[in-house]
Amino acid sequence: FMLMAKPDQTGKIDSKAEFIITVSWPDFHPDDIDVLVEDPRGQVLWFENKDTEVMHLDRDDRGSFHDQLIIDGQKISNPINQETVSLRAWVPGEYVVNVLHYKANYKEPVPVTVKIEKLNPEISLVYYGVHELNRIGMEVTAARFVLDNSGQPKSVNSLQKSLLSRLGPKA
């Protein structure tokens, strides 16, 4: 008797996400950009709090730090700079999406792209924009969006709101 998985079920990963927030900056850029997201309950997701009941920081990218691997004696670099947040569920109310220039290696501004997508029942774009960060500690509100009781985005704006200041001295 041999137990084998059905071929059509191998490698299947059931991931649940209602919204995806993607923050990216130029490939191979050494700076560390962070995403901070506040949900309607006031919980803030960021690199020190990677999981709430509603949101998860799927990828925390630190620029070029730890982007090299040795595979078969060859040094391989991952050029992609990207942070990803999944909203596995949603709570009605306002969400705030901020980007933070956590570590800078150059004086030139870094263009940071923020994209918010609603995934269900079909993929739709909630927000897309590019923001320039030009110094360590610079925090910018990319988007604030409100979800109604059915999970539909009803309004989007970029009225500034600091989330870092709410996190206290640890930040």
Please give the residue ranges for each predicted region.
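Intrinsic-disorder/low-complexity signal
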Residues: F1-A171
